[in-house]
């Protein structure tokens, strides 16, 4: 197997710290999965690439709870980390890449299934409140029955009238049980008007059939970034 370095985000002038950002790909398909993930993350506007956990803590320190960003993991076993501001400060959740999908890091003691996705953006979208996170226009990946993570699923809360039930997720850290809330990404750059329009369109395409009715060039443009966030 070949060890590949991480991918620096566009516009990042700081050199890559190869002592911390190397990981072995298990297969060509995993390599392609990560390459596609990096491409979409770079377009998302909230991928902070090589910032460290300490730097992420500083970036999020003045932000309200629920603000989050994606960065490269300092753990050589993982590619990405989700850093989120919680009621108890900034928490860092590793994103696992296994079996052709991404998930939050597993807790071996849990028996709950872990939501798994073929895209990091879909993973993030899954943990965002339904009211503030429009649906993806593409069919979701099949979930896996793997053990749950540091953010285990809980029984669904009683839904409000007209709203579907939604599971609650928690972070277990230092003996604390902290609600996981992803409400707003922390932007690393100014988005182009073209990208903002694409996100808006994605958020209003609530069915795959609507996508297939669009002209080919527009479908291709939307496919390059199929997230509403």
From Swiss-Prot:
Matching InterPro entries? SH2, SH2_dom_sf, SOCS3_SH2, SOCS3_SOCS_box, SOCS_box, SOCS_box-like_dom_sf
**Keywords, sorted A to Z:** Growth regulation, Phosphoprotein, SH2 domain, Signal transduction inhibitor, Ubl conjugation pathway
List the molecular function annotations (GO) for this entry: cytokine receptor binding
Q: What sequence ranges are listed for the domain SH2?
A: 46-142
Q: Which CDD domains match?
A: SH2_SOCS3 (cd10384), SOCS_SOCS3 (cd03737)
What are the Low complexity biased-composition ranges?
133-152
- Kindly state a single biological-process term from the GO annotations of this entry: protein ubiquitination
The annotated region (Kinase inhibitory region (KIR)) lies at 22-33
Q: Does the keyword Zinc-finger apply?
A: no
Highest taxon of the lineage = Eukaryota
Please list the residue ranges annotated as the SOCS box domain. 181-228
Keyword Metal-binding listed? The answer is: no
**Short name of one Pfam family for this protein?**
SH2
Per the record, the pathway is: Protein modification; protein ubiquitination
Region described as Extended SH2 subdomain (ESS): spans on this chain: 34-45
Q: Summarize the PTM comment.
A: Phosphorylated on tyrosine residues after stimulation by the cytokines, IL-2, EPO or IGF1.
Chain segments carrying region Disordered: 132-168
Q: Any notes on this protein's domains?
A: The ESS and SH2 domains are required for JAK phosphotyrosine binding. Further interaction with the KIR domain is necessary for signal and kinase inhibition.
Q: How does it assemble?
A: Interacts with multiple activated proteins of the tyrosine kinase signaling pathway including IGF1 receptor, insulin receptor and JAK2. Binding to JAK2 is mediated through the KIR and SH2 domains to a phosphorylated tyrosine residue within the JAK2 JH1 domain. Binds specific activated tyrosine residues of the leptin, EPO, IL12, GSCF and gp130 receptors. Interaction with CSNK1E stabilizes SOCS3 protein. Component of the probable ECS(SOSC3) E3 ubiquitin-protein ligase complex which contains CUL5, RNF7/RBX2, Elongin BC complex and SOCS3. Interacts with CUL5, RNF7, ELOB and ELOC.
Its biological purpose: SOCS family proteins form part of a classical negative feedback system that regulates cytokine signal transduction. SOCS3 is involved in negative regulation of cytokines that signal through the JAK/STAT pathway. Inhibits cytokine signal transduction by binding to tyrosine kinase receptors including IL6ST/gp130, LIF, erythropoietin, insulin, IL12, GCSF and leptin receptors. Binding to JAK2 inhibits its kinase activity and regulates IL6 signaling. Suppresses fetal liver erythropoiesis. Regulates onset and maintenance of allergic responses mediated by T-helper type 2 cells.
Q: What is this protein called?
A: Suppressor of cytokine signaling 3
Organism this protein belongs to: Bos taurus
Write the gene name. SOCS3
């Amino acid at each position: 197997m070949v060890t590949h370095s991480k991918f620096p985000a566009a516009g990042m002038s700081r050199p890559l710290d190869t002592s911390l950002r190397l990981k072995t790909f298990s297969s060509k398909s995993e390599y392609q999965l990560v390459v596609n993930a990096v491409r979409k993350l770079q377009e998302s506007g909230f991928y902070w690439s090589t910032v460290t956990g300490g730097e992420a803590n500083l970036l999020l320190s003045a932000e309200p709870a629920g603000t989050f960003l994606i960065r490269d993991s300092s753990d050589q076993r993982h590619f990405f980390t989700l850093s989120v501001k919680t009621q108890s400060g900034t928490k860092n959740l590793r994103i696992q890449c296994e079996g052709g999908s991404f998930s939050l890091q597993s807790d071996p003691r849990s028996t709950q299934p872990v939501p798994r996705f073929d895209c990091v953006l879909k993973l993030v979208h899954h943990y965002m409140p339904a009211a503030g996170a429009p649906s993806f226009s593409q069919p979701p990946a099949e979930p896996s029955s793997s053990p749950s993570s540091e953010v285990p699923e809980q029984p669904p809360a009683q839904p409000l009238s007209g709203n579907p039930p939604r599971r609650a997720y928690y972070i277990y850290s230092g003996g604390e049980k902290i609600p996981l809330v992803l409400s707003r990404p922390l932007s690393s750059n100014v988005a182009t008007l073209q990208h903002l329009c694409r996100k808006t369109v994605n958020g209003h395409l609530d069915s795959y059939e609507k996508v297939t009715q669009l002209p080919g060039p527009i479908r291709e443009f939307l496919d390059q970034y199929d997230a509403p966030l």
